[in-house]
């Protein structure tokens, strides 16, 4: 039995025992992540264990998709997959071997950094963070890949200050609809607090704008230090979006009434757009406010894309983007969301106050919790 299961897995992969696990740095519905080092070279890596539970026949299709995408994407601002390793099936693991994805190690994730009050980003450093994030999105979108889980915890930063988009467990290739036949992608993606309005309304023929909405949420979070819209349900999330971005109507979003959920849900009416008004207490730079405003546009067709965002005046006005290495060199401990102390959930930007909550563990968001 062990031999049969073992042959299904990864017969040409090295044993994961070539790495020594040092610490657990991530945990979620989809697996565990460990910091580790190569026993011979000392190279630091991150090991992402692929959950094989409930996989009665072969390798999980979601993991295969993630591996295929990561093998395609090679860019400075995308996490690098080094190799795939395994443990052999044996009686000691119920005849189920494990598969590990091996990545270059990154010292921090953005959620962990923002959770630490001692970490201070200057305007120049925020510009560099967003420049690298949008550069990564530009690259994956040019390669016809959607990330589909943009959030601060999935943005890694090395000790040298290089940002890497990570966790492609929900990513997929996309294409334009053909012969007037719309795509039928699942809309049950993206962590709730970062999920764009089109997905909340049931859209299944979507594209890169879903990732740009997440980029806008993350950009605002660079100042507020916590997620700006923390809904408990999909309807609550839509209400928070309406409070910040204005009511969802055909006037501001042509053909939005085509969605079946547009009539079924009790959408908030009479709300004016107040992105800049609500955020100006935190974000003092007018160019930053303007870019956030353009990223958090309700209608995905009017939302700014990564190319235009990179050309926005925010990145080309003083102070210019600056390196993160100096700031990070003053923090010797790795910072990850998983390792951050739990914080009490406070109020949100939509109620004009910040909060220090980082973990959506009490909401139905846990269904989409991701690691690495």
Curated annotation (Swiss-Prot):
PROSITE patterns: PROTEIN_KINASE_ATP, PROTEIN_KINASE_DOM, PROTEIN_KINASE_ST. GO terms for biological process: cellular response to cytokine stimulus; DNA repair; negative regulation of protein localization to chromatin; nucleus localization; positive regulation by host of viral transcription; positive regulation of cardiac muscle hypertrophy; positive regulation of protein localization to chromatin; positive regulation of transcription by RNA polymerase II. InterPro entries: CDK, Kinase-like_dom_sf, Prot_kinase_dom, Protein_kinase_ATP_BS, Ser/Thr_kinase_AS. ATP binds at residues 25-33, 48, 104-106, 167. It catalyses: L-seryl-[protein] + ATP = O-phospho-L-seryl-[protein] + ADP + H(+); L-threonyl-[protein] + ATP = O-phospho-L-threonyl-[protein] + ADP + H(+); [DNA-directed RNA polymerase] + ATP = phospho-[DNA-directed RNA polymerase] + ADP + H(+). Its main location: nucleus. Residues 347-366 have a biased composition (Polar residues). Residues 19-315 form the Protein kinase domain. It is found in: Nucleus; Cytoplasm; Nucleus, PML body. Autophosphorylation at Thr-186, Ser-347, Thr-350, Ser-353, Thr-354 and Ser-357 triggers kinase activity by promoting cyclin and substrate binding upon conformational changes. Thr-186 phosphorylation requires the calcium Ca(2+) signaling pathway, including CaMK1D and calmodulin. This inhibition is relieved by Thr-29 dephosphorylation. Phosphorylation at Ser-175 inhibits kinase activity. Can be phosphorylated on either Thr-362 or Thr-363 but not on both simultaneously. Keywords: Acetylation, ATP-binding, Cytoplasm, DNA damage, DNA repair, Kinase, Nucleotide-binding, Nucleus, Phosphoprotein, Serine/threonine-protein kinase, Transcription, Transcription regulation, Transferase, Ubl conjugation. Its EC number is 2.7.11.22, 2.7.11.23. The modification N6-acetyllysine is found at residues 44, 48. Component of the super elongation complex (SEC), at least composed of EAF1, EAF2, CDK9, MLLT3/AF9, AFF (AFF1 or AFF4), the P-TEFb complex and ELL (ELL, ELL2 or ELL3). Associates with CCNT1/cyclin-T1, CCNT2/cyclin-T2 (isoform A and isoform B) or CCNK/cyclin-K to form active P-TEFb. P-TEFb forms a complex with AFF4/AF5Q31 and is part of the super elongation complex (SEC). Component of a complex which is composed of at least 5 members: HTATSF1/Tat-SF1, P-TEFb complex, RNA pol II, SUPT5H, and NCL/nucleolin. PANTHER family: CELL DIVISION PROTEIN KINASE (PTHR24056), CYCLIN-DEPENDENT KINASE 9 (PTHR24056:SF233). This is Cyclin-dependent kinase 9.
């Amino acid at each position: 039995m062990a031999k049969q299961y073992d042959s299904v897995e990864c017969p040409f992969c090295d044993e994961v025992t070539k790495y020594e696990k040092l610490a657990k740095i991530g945990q979620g519905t989809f697996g565990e992540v460990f910091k580790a080092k190569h026993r011979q070279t000392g190279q630091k890596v991150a090991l992402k264990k692929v959950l094989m539970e409930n996989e009665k026949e072969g390798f999980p299709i979601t993991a295969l998709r993630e591996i295929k995408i990561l093998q395609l994407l090679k860019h400075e601002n995308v996490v690098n997959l080094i190799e795939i390793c395994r443990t052999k099936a044996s009686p000691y693991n119920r005849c189920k071997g494990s598969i590990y994805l091996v990545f270059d190690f990154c010292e921090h994730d953005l959620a962990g950094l923002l959770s630490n009050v001692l970490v201070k980003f200057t305007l120049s450093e925020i510009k560099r963070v967003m420049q690298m994030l949008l550069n990564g999105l530009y690259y994956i979108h040019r390669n016809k890949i959607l990330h589909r889980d943009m959030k601060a915890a999935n943005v890694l930063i090395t000790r040298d200050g290089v940002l890497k988009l990570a966790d492609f467990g929900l990513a997929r290739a996309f294409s334009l609809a053909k012969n007037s036949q719309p795509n039928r992608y699942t809309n049950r993606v993206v962590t709730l607090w970062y999920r764009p309005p089109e997905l909340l309304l049931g859209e299944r023929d979507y594209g890169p704008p879903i990732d740009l909405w997440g980029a806008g949420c993350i950009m605002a979070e660079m100042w507020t230090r916590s997620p700006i819209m923390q809904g408990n349900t999909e309807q609550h999330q839509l209400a928070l979006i309406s409070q910040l971005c204005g009511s969802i109507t055909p006037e501001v979003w042509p053909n939005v009434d085509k969605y079946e959920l547009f009539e079924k849900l009790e959408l908030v009416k009479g709300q004016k757009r107040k992105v800049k008004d609500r955020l100006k207490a935190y974000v003092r730079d007018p160019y930053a406010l303007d870019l956030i405003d353009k990223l958090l546009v309700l209608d995905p067709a009017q939302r700014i894309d990564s190319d235009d965002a990179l050309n926005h005046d925010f990145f080309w006005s003083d102070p210019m983007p600056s390196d993160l290495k100096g700031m990070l060199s003053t923090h010797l401990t790795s910072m990850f969301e998983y390792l951050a102390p739990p914080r009490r959930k406070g109020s949100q930007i939509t109620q004009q106050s910040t909060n220090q909550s980082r973990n959506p563990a009490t909401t139905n968001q846990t269904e989409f919790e991701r690691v690495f």
